[in-house]
Amino acid sequence: MKKLMIIILAVLFLISCNHEYQGVPESYHKLLDIAIEQAGDNAEEIKKAISESPAEQKEGMAFLISYMPERDLTSLGADFLLENVEYAYRAREEFSWCKNLPDSIFFNEVLPYANTSEDRDPWRKDFYERFSLIVKDCENIVDAIYTINKPINTEVKVEYDTRRSRVDASPKQSMEEHMATCTGLSMILTDAFRSVGIPSRLAGTGMWTNMKGNHTWSEVWVDGEWM
């Protein structure tokens, strides 16, 4: 009888563990355990983000949380994460160039909610609503890239200006100040690309060879290559 009770308890434990991450690939389970522990007082928000994700978005949410900086684990709310993931998957469903991306590219270069150390503002829904209209008639990713890049300063009303309040300003901050330097402008462009399913990331140089300043720019992933 004692042995039977041990077996039953073990089975119940396994079922409860599986239920917590139901629909999430097993390869993420240990990573999520670590992330939830690191989240501390914010753990319930992280758990809520996982549990309330639709089935088709579970892996994307698990990926974000598994590799999230600790500062975000302890501060980001479930609603922020759920909205970010929802609109990333909307872009994947809507635009052919995003639908056909490998998961590794989608997870790393479309799904993220931030680039570097900028404030974690909820930009994705706003940018999706702005830029999906601009690229809705584009036939391919190259056309979409040029279609966004050309009018973006006018769309967000941000110009290059070294009087900006901080180098790593978030898109929201830059749009409120109507100014940014190369880093802030590149974050806006990268997030605009990501909002419509175009894989994008920041690139840069810490110092030019003539020792006269640095630079940041946006790269895009087209046909298997970074440009």
Task: Enumerate the language-model features and the residues they cover.
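The N-terminal extracellular segments of secreted preproproteins, especially immediately downstream
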Residues: 12-16, 181
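A generic structural signal for short, solvent-exposed coil/turn residues
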Residues: 9, 38-40, 192, 210
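Hydrophobic/aromatic-rich core segments of domains that either
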Residues: 139, 144, 150, 162-172, ...
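N-terminal accessory/pre-domain segments preceding catalytic cores
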Residues: 17-161, 174, 195, 222-227
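Sec-dependent N-terminal signal peptides
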Residues: 4-13
